[in-house]
Curated annotation (Swiss-Prot):
Listed GO biological process terms: translation
Organism: Roseobacter denitrificans (strain ATCC 33942 / OCh 114) (Erythrobacter sp. (strain OCh 114))
InterPro entries named among the record's database cross-references: Ribosomal_Su5_D2-typ_SF (IPR020568), Ribosomal_uS5 (IPR000851), Ribosomal_uS5_bac-type (IPR005712), Ribosomal_uS5_C (IPR005324), Ribosomal_uS5_N (IPR013810), Ribosomal_uS5_N_CS (IPR018192), Ribsml_uS5_D2-typ_fold_subgr (IPR014721)
Gene3D superfamilies on file: 3.30.160.20, 3.30.230.10
Region Disordered, residue ranges: 155-191
Record note on quaternary structure: Part of the 30S ribosomal subunit. Contacts proteins S4 and S8.
HAMAP family per UniProt: Ribosomal_uS5_B
Family, per entry: Belongs to the universal ribosomal protein uS5 family.
Name of this chain's protein: Small ribosomal subunit protein uS5
GO molecular function: rRNA binding; structural constituent of ribosome
Residue span, S5 DRBM domain: 21-84
GO CC aspect terms: small ribosomal subunit
Comp. bias (Low complexity): 181-191
Length: 191
């Protein structure tokens, strides 16, 4: 019995020391709560966390002090992480759209060297996700909370070629576009 308890503690400790995540503070607001004696002020923080290898999450936290609000938001973000398959480890597999409330976000995969073309909160999500080339546009609500939720909604809808092939009962090679690999003309002339 004691051995099993030690093993559990060891697992929990190992989980806490798991890969370190990068985090980005997106927004911080002063909030107030009206009580009988007046107003109590506090702070709300919005944080995006990711491993820059395809995992990302966001969280919000409220507290009387800024560092505590950021800590709470970071903890929530780590608990709510999602995994997104990236094409060539740098961009999205296909164009997608996400919605939340009055906010709509359109995300498009981009050729190598394009960079991250995204505004404010969306840029933080893509950087923490590890995307290097993407073009995105937010339409409607510019509220950072809505923009991040809409971006996450779109990312959850992404389908990797493997999952599409599995649904269709085909091979991954049949799904991906074919690229002709013809030898360069200079090599054939010399030979």
């Amino acid at each position: 019995m004691a051995e099993r308890d030690n093993n559990r503690r060891g697992n929990r400790r190992d989980r806490d020391e798991a890969p370190e995540f990068a985090d980005r503070l997106v927004a911080i607001n002063r909030v107030s709560k009206t009580v009988k004696g007046g107003k109590r002020f506090g702070f709300a923080a919005l944080v995006v966390v990711g491993d820059q290898k395809g995992r990302v999450g966001f969280g919000k936290g409220k507290a009387k002090e800024v560092p505590e609000a950021i800590r709470k938001a970071t903890e929530q973000a780590k608990r709510q992480m999602i995994r997104v398959q990236l094409r060539e480890g740098r961009t999205l597999h296909h164009d997608m759209e996400g919605r939340h409330g009055a906010g709509k976000v359109v995300m498009r995969s981009a050729p190598e060297g394009t960079g991250i073309i995204a505004g404010g909160p969306m840029r933080a999500v893509f950087e923490m996700l590890g995307v290097k080339d993407v073009v995105s546009k937010s339409i409607g609500s510019q509220n950072p909370y809505n923009m991040i939720r809409a971006t996450m909604d779109g990312l959850r809808k992404e389908s990797s070629p493997r999952s599409v092939a599995q649904r269709r009962g085909k091979k991954v090679a049949d799904i991906l576009p074919k690229v002709d690999a013809a030898p360069a003309p200079a090599e054939t002339a010399e030979a």
